[in-house]
Amino acid sequence: MDTEAIGLAIAFFVIALAYAAVGQAGASGYIAAMALSGFSPLAIKPTALALNLMVSAIGTAQFLKVGQVSWRNVYPFAILGFPASALGGSVHLPERVYHPVLGLILVVSAIQMARSALRKSALVITIPKTPPLHAALITGAVIGFVSGTTGSGGGVFLAPVILFKNWGTAHQTAATTAVYNLMNSTAALIGACASWNALPNFLPWWLIAVAAGGSIGALIGSRYLSASWLRVILSVLLMVSGLKLLW
């Protein structure tokens, strides 16, 4: 591997570790890192989805192991999210549109997450509500299409919605978004099959890097991080990634 590929492998390891700790797979971080390295959207999208798929699979397995996945909370978002993500995966945005759109969405999500983390009421344990089916179906479909179009997996957008609507605790949200990421990344990668030939030759090494980082992060997030810290860390990650894509 050349110096740039090694540097990205290290960056991907750190990104996967940090994101997996909060139930995310890191697609927005991978996208930001590759965009800053000069990769085209045609290569960024399938690569980010492949890396996202690896980490979300590890995260899902870890959350299943500790019994934190509630399928009642997952399937309403996935029913329409999966096909919508596959449809979005087949859509290719030009670079001048791709980066600002994704960056803006991430910044808005970060602000909402930060407000939730800093409010005293957000740190008080409350009984979460079960997501209403119709609302979850619409949310899953919209986020699925947007995430498929941008190559971001979707969990990074779904988490703020779940927490804001009190549809789950911080740990339940992390578990739900890990599964949602896995399903939507798979669907979007299938939808983006036309750009598979743009995948970098270094992808296998990057997959190993994110697998290692994701394993460590998922273990930390599922067992050791408090609910308030999960919110704070996720908001910071969202803001940094969004600002990098905007500027």
Curated annotation (Swiss-Prot):
One of the Pfam families matching this protein, by short name: TauE
InterPro entries the record matches: TM_pro_TauE-like (IPR002781), TSUP/Inactive_protease-like (IPR051598)
Subcellular location as annotated: Cell membrane
Record key words, sorted: Cell membrane, Membrane, Plasmid, Transmembrane, Transmembrane helix, Transport
Keyword Cell membrane among record annotations: yes
Keyword Transport: yes
Transmembrane segments: 5-25, 31-51, 74-94, 121-141, 202-222, 227-247
Membrane topology: Multi-pass membrane protein
GO cellular component, one term: plasma membrane
Source taxon at top rank: Bacteria
PANTHER family: MEMBRANE TRANSPORTER PROTEIN MJ0441-RELATED, MEMBRANE TRANSPORTER PROTEIN-RELATED
UniProt similarity note: Belongs to the 4-toluene sulfonate uptake permease (TSUP) (TC 2.A.102) family.
Name the record gives this protein: Probable membrane transporter protein y4hK
Lineage: Bacteria, Pseudomonadati, Pseudomonadota, Alphaproteobacteria, Hyphomicrobiales
